[in-house]
């Protein structure tokens, strides 16, 4: 009787869809039973230990990326470099990751894997390259070489290709069902926030604790990198022993997607579908929204040590605490928001984050012109910028996997990662060169980019609409 009931439900859905098709109302449909027990594809998840290692890798990689922020400007000056090099040092890893993105994709998807991604390969590569990078950075003072710092950050950039796989892992249809992609995307952002929070704090704390050291090996500029090298060794060994690879789908039952309207008018859900102009436009707009959000975050983050030094005479340790406290506040906010994502669509989340960034920029410009740039409002603005940028970027890949044909998921994923890598690099260089131009220029560029993102999202708003019906 139960099987007959499920069959009747499926037939009723099929009849409804046939009527719609006859009336000229086009839809993209994949059917599945309404019985949750009969539809494991609606709830399948990746191996717990592997997912935990991917999240932990994300956090520690963000620490490696930002641990130099509080001390980079002083370290460069200590070695005789110019002011602009501080931003280059911060942003160099992501541009390196962008250059190496295609080779890493080939490395992680060999022919023997039959189309599946071997996540262990980029995971292992990120650990090894970070170990080498941190050791080289820590030896730069001994060598009295700014060039060695740059080379060390290039090695860190090899590891930063892993940022692509953090997002891809939690949107891979072979590992995780569509039901969990948005929430796991937010959790991934929370872990990144923890790393972005801990990085400046650890960097400032290690600098303060070793400030009196006269050694060229272990001092305020290098101690944090020695610490991270040891942490990466531990993560490498743990991953080598425990990481579980999935090279086949966890279920043969497909996910259900019923759309009342075309998500992309010229993308048909069949094996012969083409991406088309609208599909390319959707990918571009979603990627650009991620670029504008992360450009703002990285520009602010790189400028905080400089700006607080100019306005409040902050030390590296104080600047690191400033950055870390903002991140600590954001962690519970993002956790709460991860619960609220069940009531919001992906496009709503992206738009909300971009609008919050615009409001923050308008307030900061107003405060700047009134001459009341006290530390408290500046801190609140940076905290909200952190939150807005994090939520604006968190569902980008998840959204593209819902509105694009599966054969184009990788293209969308790579496009988002390219935009983030560019924003990390350009934003960090822009913020690191804060002394070279007026604060008004800084605010204006950040504001214009986010306004453009909102306008672009509104233009294609209907194309981003998707209604999911999960078993």
Curated annotation (Swiss-Prot):
It is found in: Golgi apparatus; Membrane. GO terms for biological process: transmembrane transport. GO terms for molecular function: transmembrane transporter activity. The chain crosses the membrane at residues 48-68, 85-105, 123-140, 145-165, 186-206, 223-243, 277-297, 320-340, 349-369, 379-399, 414-434, 440-460. Gene3D superfamilies: MFS general substrate transporter like domains. It is a multi-pass membrane protein. InterPro entries: MFS, MFS_Domain-Containing_Protein, MFS_trans_sf. Its main location: Golgi. Keywords: Golgi apparatus, Membrane, Transmembrane, Transmembrane helix, Transport. The keyword Cell division does not apply. Pfam families: MFS_1 (PF07690). GO terms for cellular component: cell division site; cell tip; Golgi apparatus; membrane. It comes from the Eukaryota. Belongs to the major facilitator superfamily. This is Uncharacterized MFS-type transporter C757.11c.
